[in-house]
UniProtKB/Swiss-Prot annotation:
The lineage of its organism: Bacteria, Pseudomonadati, Pseudomonadota, Gammaproteobacteria, Pasteurellales. This is 4-hydroxy-3-methylbut-2-en-1-yl diphosphate synthase (flavodoxin). PANTHER family: 4-HYDROXY-3-METHYLBUT-2-EN-1-YL DIPHOSPHATE SYNTHASE (PTHR30454), 4-HYDROXY-3-METHYLBUT-2-EN-1-YL DIPHOSPHATE SYNTHASE (FERREDOXIN), CHLOROPLASTIC (PTHR30454:SF0). [4Fe-4S] cluster binds at residues 271, 274, 306, 313. Its cofactor is [4Fe-4S] cluster. The gene is ispG. It catalyses: (2E)-4-hydroxy-3-methylbut-2-enyl diphosphate + oxidized [flavodoxin] + H2O + 2 H(+) = 2-C-methyl-D-erythritol 2,4-cyclic diphosphate + reduced [flavodoxin]. Gene3D superfamilies: Dihydropteroate synthase-like, Sulfite Reductase Hemoprotein, domain 1.
């Protein structure tokens, strides 16, 4: 890794806890996702949550639209370890029910669950059980009067919506909450978060909502979340993809890794290849990404197909391979080794070297 390390000054915020996961303050930025199974299908939902746990999800959100789903949530909660957020709209009784069942966070908007006595019931319950709340404002469901006032979703409109809900919790003397102001438009979301970051001290949950499929959604999320994170804004994030939720976690960590905010697993530095490549770089990278998904130890591995950029990248990597005629150069901790890799067997040889280096480090934190 390059010695150049720009300083990102993190926005100051209060700290809350979602289960045992701290959010805000000096806590690491948490990565989360949301299940897309039917919540009433307990077996499928538990299986998906466990798959998210395996790739590093800090928190998982589950939609709880009905009382039947709330009963299913009870069974789900008993079978998983990761903190669960219940996503609830309109019916305050569902929030009270999942609170009985050990929910770790309630995603509600106080303004859309009815009369103040209902809001107070939910807030009092959350306070008694030490359950935080997430206020989630979305450009696609902006209040009708704000749409009429502003003509369309604007940063000011999203901010006003968020502050309405914040005011309700303030009035009830409840401060254990985080807030999101999501939009599918990158610039709208980014500016909304900038305004919100100046207006409140609570932690911010980042997201570019409904970002799209795996490729386009990852790009939009990387651009939008990257802009905010580089400014020190954000305490937890979700990458919203029309894809397997597991990909949301992987992309989320890749964004944090790219900004050197939080690293998990292998960071591959690989060339796009040209006619100078001496071995199959693309195939090597694809194979190693799959084989090494179990490793959580942060590590930079450079895989470069020729000697133009290979040695330079290897010098600042934990491990590196530089393409050569029939055999390729091998670097460890920035130093060239006498050993060379057979170009036909680079995947196996490099995997073995990576796993050996991981094994020499903290054994408690090397693999899933």
């Amino acid at each position: 890794m390059s010695a150049f390390q720009p300083t990102i000054k993190r926005r100051e915020s209060t700290k809350i806890y979602v289960g045992n996961v701290p959010i805000g303050g000096d806590a690491p930025i948490a990565v989360q996702s949301m299940t897309n199974t039917r919540t009433t299908d307990v077996e499928a939902t538990v299986a998906q949550i466990k798959s998210l746990e395996r790739v590093g999800a800090d928190i998982v959100r589950v939609s709880v639209p009905t009382m039947d789903a709330a009963e299913a949530f009870k069974q789900i909660k008993q079978q998983v370890n990761v903190p669960l957020v219940a996503d609830i709209h309109f019916d305050y009784r569902i929030a009270l029910k999942v609170a009985e069942y050990g929910v770790d966070c309630l995603r509600i908007n106080p303004g859309n669950i009815g009369r103040e006595d209902r809001v107070r019931a939910v807030v009092d319950c959350a306070r008694d059980k030490n359950i935080p709340i997430r206020i989630g404002v979305n450009a696609g469901s902006l209040e009708k009067d704000l749409q009429e006032k502003y003509g369309e979703p604007t940063p000011e409109a999203l901010l006003e919506s968020a502050l309405r809900h914040v005011e309700i919790l303030d009035r009830l003397n409840f401060d254990q909450f985080k807030v999101s102001v999501k939009a599918s438009d990158v610039f709208l979301a980014v500016e909304s978060y900038r305004l919100l970051a100046k207006a409140i001290k609570q932690p911010l949950h980042l997201g570019i909502t409904e970002a799209g499929g795996a490729r386009a959604g990852a790009v939009k999320s990387a651009v939008g979340l990257g802009m905010l994170l580089a400014e020190g804004i954000g305490d937890t994030l979700r990458v919203s993809l029309a894809a397997d939720p597991v990909e949301e976690i992987k992309v989320g960590f890749d964004i944090l890794k790219s900004l050197r905010i939080r690293s998990r697993g292998i960071n591959f530095i690989a060339c796009p290849t040209c006619s100078r490549q001496e071995f199959d770089v693309i195939g090597t990278v694809n194979a190693l990404e799959q084989r090494l998904e179990d490793i959580i130890t942060p590590m930079d591995v450079s895989i470069i197909g020729c000697v133009v950029n290979g040695p330079g990248e290897a010098l600042v990597s934990d491990l590196g391979v530089t393409g050569g005629n029939k055999k390729s150069g091998y670097y460890l901790d920035g130093e060239r080794q006498k050993e060379r890799f057979d170009n036909e067997d680079i995947v196996n040889q490099l995997e073995a070297k990576i796993r050996a280096k991981v094994a020499r480090q903290d054994p408690k934190n090397r693999i899933i």
